[in-house]
Amino acid sequence: TAFAAGEMGKPCGDASSFLESERGTALLAVSDGMGTGEKAAAESKAAIELLEQFAVAGFSRELAVQLINSALLLRRAEENYATLDICSVDLYDGQAEFIKLGAVASFICRGNRVISVYAHSLPAGILEQVRVEKNDMRLKDGDLILLLTDGITDAFGGERQTAQWLEEKFLPQGFANPQDAADFILQAAQEHCQKEPDDRTVQAARFWKKIA
């Protein structure tokens, strides 16, 4: 994971997590709190910590999302909300499930092409009931999953422009190490940004088929 705060001297308003369960599931998650600074950081951190607790307790991802939404709603007087971007990967069969609440597109880098994963939903903490949109995909050997916050995609001009940049500029680099990949994308976003920067987070994870 690589991240940068939008405002100098203030905490990054994004939060992220990577968990691997004994049940053979890897969970990646990124949350973007409203605005920047300490308030945004508190919102995104709360969402991620709740997700981690529910995941460890064995709750379904759909129920966890509903409970996180309810928790943020209890603080609605303070106009708190946060995006939630979740990817769960079954490490036995490579099945990946993406769940998004207000989050920008995720990307799967596969060989020389980029697959975009979209969803149209509001962030957590706005409506009493959230519509959980799921996208299921079967991963292939060597796939790289990228979860980003809008500070990254906005720097490149949008989600489609980000996908194009990934294909043209990122894939030719041939990064095997996910951390190197995340660092490269973050640095490039900082160089491309033409307006006041937002908090920026890149979470990268690569999955290989286990050799028997």
Residue ranges and their predicted role:
Residues G35-A57, L139, D143-C193, I211:
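Active-site-proximal, acidic helix/loop segment immediately C-terminal to a metal-coordinating Asp/Glu
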Residues L27-S31, I145, Q203-A205:
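Short, well-ordered beta-strand elements
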Residues G9-G24, Y81-L84, S116-G157, C193, ...:
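Acidic loop->beta-strand submotif enriched in PP2C/PPM serine/threonine phosphatases
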Residues A41-G111, A189-A205:
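Catalytic core of PPM/PP2C metal-dependent serine/threonine phosphatase domains
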Residues T1-G33, K39, A46-E49, V132-N135:
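N-terminal entry segment of metal-dependent catalytic domains or homologous docking segments
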Residues A205-I211:
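Short beta-strand-to-coil "C-cap" segments at the C-terminal boundary of structured domains/repeats
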Residues E97-D141, L147, T162-L171, F175, ...:
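PP2C/PPM-type serine/threonine phosphatase catalytic core
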